[in-house]
Amino acid sequence: MSVITPDTVEILLTVLKAVVILLVVVTCGAFMSFGERRLLGLFQNRYGPSRVGWGGSLQLVADMIKMFFKEDWVPPFTDRLIFTLAPMIAFCSLLLSFAIVPVAPGWMGADLNIGILFFLMMAGLAVYAVLFAGWSSNNKYSLLGAMRASAQTLSYEVFLGLSLMGVVAQAGSFNMQVIVDSQTHLWNIIPQFFGFLTFIIAGVAVCHRHPFDQPEAEQELADGYHIEYSGMKFGLFFVGEYIGIVTISALIVTLFFGGWHGPWLPPFIWFAIKTAFFMVMFILVRASLPRPRYDQVMAFGWRICLPLTLINLLVTAAVILYHAQ
């Protein structure tokens, strides 16, 4: 009896696809750190990284070498086990969030019927990493940053989930592949424009990106919950943040802009172009908007985003019921 059966081959191909996709995501997250610095330099009329390699092309390699050889110091006053687990949980949860995103027909890490719920679960799991990092560091700035991050993330995850319910109701499924197929003739950005607005705002807040980077506010908290981290532990937090940006950008494309659908070019190329556009938008927002106060961030979520998502969901339900009659 042969060990290699059609089922075994299918499982191996699925695992291989998942590994390739996740490796590409990690690479994109790493390269985004270099791209962000170059674009910020362009936006601010100055040079970005330009010393290592031609035009700064090897800056990422230099940063990786520096990160690998930095001392991985654990302060003696920390809870060593939790302190070490926190960056691993943060990195893995953000990376696994991308597994449900279809980058082309048949190309996704995990074809789950509850794809959107899986993403929300992974986003919620990242909150534990932040809390673990802040509490185990035994530092007042870390703890304050972790408390801010957990309150902000849990609040905006409510709007993140509600903004997706209109898309789910229209497609009739939580499966990402089904949602993409439902946009063959009309992208969800048109009927779900308010859902898109609240999703992109909540996505920025969940990623702790400027202007919602209150947990890491340098002027107030001296870099927040990862102030005590160094070496590869800090590197996992750092790359994880950019992986979060890649994931949110890919989800925006998948849920509201037709995923891989587009004329002439191959599906994967269309998906990459659309995702890159929103990644640049994240950087542009960082370069152009000021940071509001923490109470203003929370008030904006509960007073503006929550009513907007509920109105969008109510209107979507009314339209679906009208067409069903």
UniProtKB/Swiss-Prot annotation:
Q: Which GO terms describe its cellular component?
A: plasma membrane
Entry GO MF terms:
NADH dehydrogenase activity; oxidoreductase activity, acting on NAD(P)H, quinone or similar compound as acceptor; quinone binding
Q: What is its EC number?
A: 7.1.1.-
Q: State the reactions this protein catalyses.
A: a quinone + NADH + 5 H(+)(in) = a quinol + NAD(+) + 4 H(+)(out)
Compartments, record wording: Cell inner membrane
Instruction: State the UniProt keywords alphabetically.
Output: Cell inner membrane, Cell membrane, Membrane, NAD, Quinone, Translocase, Transmembrane, Transmembrane helix, Ubiquinone
Task: Locate the transmembrane regions by residue number.
Answer: 11-31, 50-69, 81-101, 114-134, 154-174, 186-206, 237-257, 265-285, 304-324
Source taxon at top rank: Bacteria
**How does the UniProt record describe the way this protein sits in the membrane?**
Multi-pass membrane protein
Q: Name one Pfam family in it.
A: NADHdh
Q: Which GO terms describe its biological process?
A: aerobic respiration
Which protein family is it in?
Belongs to the complex I subunit 1 family.
Q: How does it assemble?
A: NDH-1 is composed of 13 different subunits. Subunits NuoA, H, J, K, L, M, N constitute the membrane sector of the complex.
Q: What does this protein do?
A: NDH-1 shuttles electrons from NADH, via FMN and iron-sulfur (Fe-S) centers, to quinones in the respiratory chain. The immediate electron acceptor for the enzyme in this species is believed to be ubiquinone. Couples the redox reaction to proton translocation (for every two electrons transferred, four hydrogen ions are translocated across the cytoplasmic membrane), and thus conserves the redox energy in a proton gradient. This subunit may bind ubiquinone.
Q: What is this protein called?
A: NADH-quinone oxidoreductase subunit H
Q: Which organism is it from?
A: Edwardsiella ictaluri (strain 93-146)
